[in-house]
A protein has these predicted regions:
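Short, charged/polar low-complexity linear motifs in solvent-exposed/disordered segments
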Residues: 48, 54-55, 62, 130, ...
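A surface-exposed partner-binding patch
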Residues: 1-109, 176-181
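Compact, glycine/acidic-enriched structural inserts
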Residues: 124-156
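Acidic surface patches and DE-rich sequence motifs
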Residues: 105, 118, 129-130
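A short alpha->loop->secondary-structure connector
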Residues: 120-122
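Acidic, proline/glycine-rich low-complexity IDRs
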Residues: 146-181
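Short, surface-exposed beta-strand/loop micro-motifs that present aromatic residues
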Residues: 109-117
Length: 181
């Protein structure tokens, strides 16, 4: 499914296990993201975003979805304490307070789900670029990819990019560590 949408650069995949479908007791991972990480796994998406895979509770992988989600939730809490102008809007503050981060860009943007509004096994996807703003990207992971690679839609999300992102995926190896240092 996703291999038809993306050009794959490499062939050594680190895939998510099919039996791990959540990283929290409160919400399940969206179907479209599970399909992606079970098909393509951990790597660099669109030459910019690092995709993380669920590896199970108490795993020793710093690049697991569980560990990265916890790390970015802590970072978000620190930003909430800072008087950023982008957080003066009540909607943005509430989005950040309820965010479930799942991807990070090499430019510093963080992609997250708003799990308060599930629909058909999916959650709205947002991209936050501190201190610039929070941008709605789509309702499922395939839409996330297509909106950022489309000439007509990428600029409404990636304000400082001059062209749409390339539809690529580069598989990467997951590092086993006990900290995020």
């Amino acid at each position: 499914m996703y291999q038809e949408l993306l050009t794959i650069k490499g062939d050594s995949y680190c895939l998510a296990k099919e039996d791990i479908t959540c990283i929290s007791d409160n919400w399940a991972l969206p179907t479209s993201y599970l399909e992606f990480v079970q098909e393509l796994g951990f790597g660099r998406l669109l030459e910019l975003f690092l995709t993380y895979i669920p590896m199970g509770k108490d795993n020793n992988y710093c690049d697991s979805l569980e560990r990265r989600n916890a790390y970015w939730k802590d970072v978000f809490q620190q930003y909430i304490q800072v008087p950023l102008s982008m957080l003066k809007k009540k909607e943005n503050l509430e989005l950040l307070m309820n965010a479930e981060p799942f991807m990070f860009s090499e430019n510093g943007e963080v992609v997250f789900w708003d799990v308060r509004y599930p629909k058909a096994g999916e959650y709205p996807i947002y991209l936050v670029h501190f201190p610039v703003g929070i941008y709605f990207v789509g309702y499922h992971f395939r839409e996330f990819i297509t909106r950022l690679t489309c000439e007509e839609t990428y600029k409404s999300i990636l304000k400082f990019h001059e062209s749409p992102l390339l539809p690529t995926f580069e598989p990467l190896s997951v590092n086993q560590m006990t900290s995020l240092s």
